[in-house]
């Protein structure tokens, strides 16, 4: 909360610093470099999970579990038909070789954010360092929940469990490169 209240300041040597909460708040100033440092930022954006079944991409969805045995009262199910998200996000993946049951996770918000960061950085001659969970590949089922620093089922205690998913740094790098950014790539910690 204290960080939200403080919107500007300066270093001990008098260099001004400004904090912003969205990238569109950043000034379009090509005379000053834009430096972005983000830790565990991209992994919190929503993900869509898809499973390849009978030649179609079906989406994993949350459903109500009416069984008496279920302590969570929610369950993950596959859509019965392609969803608008599976058509939009996976429609161009039909030419690839996928096997029955293959899964893919996609975060359109993380990709759009990387594209926006790249645009700002390229325009200003700055740089970005994004430190996060992930790999140089697409995950299929990395969505997980955390509560009190422990891994927990994402469907338990809705609204009280933090969710996270691995970042696809390869996909993020591709969208950044399309905006003109020089991408170094994911480096293991």
Please annotate each region the language model reported:
Residues 21-189:
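Class I S-adenosyl-L-methionine
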Residues 2-32:
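S-adenosyl-L-methionine
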